[in-house]
């Protein structure tokens, strides 16, 4: 158990550590599944290919909708024509897969050799007749989740700027509504349309699994709010319309570049809300959207209380315990806020990069949660130095460390409970109903160790026998 100290304001520090994270080209792993009519072409070296092959775990026989354009010595020494080579590959992709969009993912090497992908794409797009989106998701980013941010920022430029007039185009674009209205009579659909409050169009951005998209869309529908579209959509042809003055809201804390693009280039209005992670975050996210549209939220108190009651069997395992975030995927602030609400003390939040404007509502909510729960506010460390962090872990002795994969086993060998931060990226953690999945991940190492203690296995490392 930890002794609660006087709550204090958030303390921000910045160290000069290296970034310990996956390469952002790993965003291909979930984006190619999300955008069903896409093809991702990663332009890089053999190293990028090995990483993708290991990270994805997809056999070549499965014919996945991504490929590796491997740069050779001829490319780097400018003996080969970049345009001719990329044209050959894209024509082959068109012939074999015929996607609605080809996404070129630039890497460190294309940056270093100054390959002008943005200049090549429009000309080639005109020749092959397929849109080509260029995203520089290279290893020069702070966190691997920013690969998605780069791709969505590039996709935002391709969203139509006028609502469709033709009926056929309307049907093609309203995919979310068609999914929700599947199998219903026209009269029922018309009746449900009348339930929505009159408000400006709202577009949500962030790549989430389809069940979570449906859940969040329905939660807003209960408040009379209609979601005009999602970025990214299931299909490239269904990208949402973005006219000047449209409202946009993010669902992930690592999408600051996309938010900036939507505001500056597409002249949209950003709703600065906390993110819908955990019951408290989901409630605050819905409340903020309602307040912007002048709607009084209904039934959120009961909904949140009901979810917390269902989480009690997990919450009692971590209440009073301490957690330390080493920093990996930019979800740290949202997870820290949720765990404080669960009764944990967050000792430190390491984060590779902090956009204080985009995460302002989340930071304010974390500070408020610490005050209301009577626990000290965590130290916020941007770009943490791992050597210093390990020393602080030895001093603070947290009950759990949430860390990148590289440090998990060394810390476990020293008797420190760890959880891989990458698992929170791939798990369904958004919305009211998925809060249980977050606690399932957080409590797993603690439950495992309790089970091992019951068996009499207290130590991971075998001690030397004394003869």
From Swiss-Prot:
Keywords, in A-Z order: 4Fe-4S, ATP-binding, Chlorophyll biosynthesis, Iron, Iron-sulfur, Metal-binding, Nucleotide-binding, Oxidoreductase, Photosynthesis
Keyword Iron-sulfur: yes
Cofactor: [4Fe-4S] cluster
Keyword hit for rRNA-binding: no
Pathway assigned in UniProt: Porphyrin-containing compound metabolism; chlorophyll biosynthesis (light-independent)
Catalysed reaction, written as an equation: chlorophyllide a + oxidized 2[4Fe-4S]-[ferredoxin] + 2 ADP + 2 phosphate = protochlorophyllide a + reduced 2[4Fe-4S]-[ferredoxin] + 2 ATP + 2 H2O
GO biological process: light-independent chlorophyll biosynthetic process; photosynthesis, dark reaction
Enzyme class: oxidoreductase
Residue runs in coiled coils: none
EC number: 1.3.7.7
Alphabetized Pfam families for the sequence: Oxidored_nitro
Molecular function as annotated in GO: 4 iron, 4 sulfur cluster binding; ATP binding; metal ion binding; oxidoreductase activity, acting on iron-sulfur proteins as donors; oxidoreductase activity, acting on the CH-CH group of donors, iron-sulfur protein as acceptor
Cofactor note: Binds 1 [4Fe-4S] cluster per heterodimer. The cluster is bound at the heterodimer interface by residues from both subunits.
Ligand binding ([4Fe-4S] cluster): 23, 48, 108
Chain's role: Component of the dark-operative protochlorophyllide reductase (DPOR) that uses Mg-ATP and reduced ferredoxin to reduce ring D of protochlorophyllide (Pchlide) to form chlorophyllide a (Chlide). This reaction is light-independent. The NB-protein (ChlN-ChlB) is the catalytic component of the complex.
Protein family membership: Belongs to the BchN/ChlN family.
Subunit structure, interactors included: Protochlorophyllide reductase is composed of three subunits; ChlL, ChlN and ChlB. Forms a heterotetramer of two ChlB and two ChlN subunits.
The name this protein goes by in its record: Light-independent protochlorophyllide reductase subunit N
